[in-house]
Amino acid sequence: MSDILVPLIFTDAAAKKVKFLIEGEENPELRLRVYITGGGCSGFQYGFTFDDKLNEGDLTIENLDVALVIDPMSLQYLIGATIDYVEGLDGSRFVVQNPNASSTCGCGASFSI
């Protein structure tokens, strides 16, 4: 990562997993997009998808030669967050550690502010 201040952290573990998944898709233009939608048991939920397009206003954060992309609407809910990838007994997944969330559901997939 560069010395430029970014509003959230894209961990090495997450970047390594993204890089592995992109290599499997054989499309080097893919980026991991994280976004917020309404729903879930706590009001908002996180979403992850691969995207090969950038939209106007998207923020791109690079780590280990891969990119994380966030749209402006979602970014306001993610400032200060950490995007990570964890593996454990309950499976493996991308996770968001969000200091803006006042509460989260039991599985961590949705949150409220």
UniProtKB/Swiss-Prot annotation:
Q: How is the cofactor bound here?
A: Binds 1 iron-sulfur cluster per subunit.
Q: Does the keyword Metal-binding apply?
A: yes
> Which cofactors?
iron-sulfur cluster
Return one Gene Ontology term, BP aspect: iron-sulfur cluster assembly
A Pfam entry, by short name: Fe-S_biosyn
Question: What residues bind iron-sulfur cluster, as annotated?
Answer: 41, 105, 107
The UniProt entry, under InterPro entries, shows: FeS_biogenesis (IPR000361), FeS_cluster_insertion (IPR016092), FeS_cluster_insertion_CS (IPR017870), FeS_cluster_insertion_RrpA (IPR023063), HesB-like_dom_sf (IPR035903)
Q: What keywords does the record list, in alphabetical order?
A: Iron, Iron-sulfur, Metal-binding
Task: Please provide one cellular component term from the Gene Ontology annotations of this protein.
Answer: cytosol
Among HAMAP family, the record links this protein to: Fe_S_insert_ErpA (MF_01380)
Could you describe the subunit structure of this protein?
A: Homodimer.
Q: Give the family from UniProt.
A: Belongs to the HesB/IscA family.
- Protein name listed in UniProt: Iron-sulfur cluster insertion protein ErpA
Organism, scientific name: Glaesserella parasuis serovar 5 (strain SH0165) (Haemophilus parasuis)
The taxonomy runs: Bacteria, Pseudomonadati, Pseudomonadota, Gammaproteobacteria, Pasteurellales
